[in-house]
Amino acid sequence: MKESIKAFINEIERVKGKKTLDFKDIIELNGPRLTVDNQLTEEEFIDAMIDYCKKEKEKTCPYCHRKNVVKYGFTKNTKQRYKCKECGRYYCTTTNTPMYYSKKDMKKWYEYYKLIENMTPIRQCAKKLDISIGTAFQWRHKILNAIMPMLKGKMEGTIEIDEVLIPESFKGNHSKNLSFRMDRAPVRRQRSASQYIGCEKVSILCCKDRNENVFTRTGDKGKVGYFRLYELLADKVTERSVLCTTNNMGYIPLARKLNCKLYKLRGRYEVVDEKYHIQNARAFGRGIVNTINYKFKGVATKYLNFYLSWFHWQEASKRHTRSMKLKDMLSMSVYSNQRLRVCDFKNVTSLPS
């Protein structure tokens, strides 16, 4: 057991030595080079992640990233406590992870990760783990917030880009938020289609290349403009790629700026030279919209990027086994050094300011 845990931690250390971390690097943690990983049980993997967190916090401070760190007792939950002698701040082994400030044990978190991997609805998660609906909601968004910056795969070759529109949503309980103001009139039933067009809809950018690499993010209210497109795709599109896009005029200066060839299609079913189209990106986008509308019964616009990163991860790991996907998500969320406290939820946003 100790050898398998040590091998797993060594593989994470090997990946961490790189300047940039790609999703494919995380996949390699479960690749053929780590043969003992196939024998890891649930308990061993939990111990491996705890040992890795402990080892990381003993090295550097998660706040100032300096190495002058000493042990400083234990928390009420018997977690090792540390003090940084440079910035004077205190932290424990779970600082800047989804488990930060959690009073539940790692076993219950591990079970929740299993439910996240299956995209289980919040109420079912709460019922199976005997936790409140509010806790299940917060855990989901803490995990999705952690994995979002880890999905950095670039796209190359022929890249399809489509935009799908969904109504702006203010779903949620706002009774305790005294500062909440809805910036539009309430949506009534049986409205005409023309009343939903324009700024009341939010665009989702869906990108996919022929190597199955994907990227998706919230665009803007209405159509996405050039500046927002460049902000989202500047570091995602490889130079000299071929862009197959919708009839949005913002892609013309984008292709010129990124030194890419552009095929701007007038219809979603148009095909140029029998190979340039956006049907794969369109299918990816329709899958996202259908899941949001019919499985989750709508998603608040402010949390939309969290769910898009979830779809991104599901699409990128669809060919991997269930156990491999579970370990990928656990590894990414622990390594990302991201935190989302309950008091931070009110500041979450997906649309540009």
Place the predicted regions along the sequence by residue.
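Residue-level recognition of single "structural anchor" positions
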Residues: 1-353
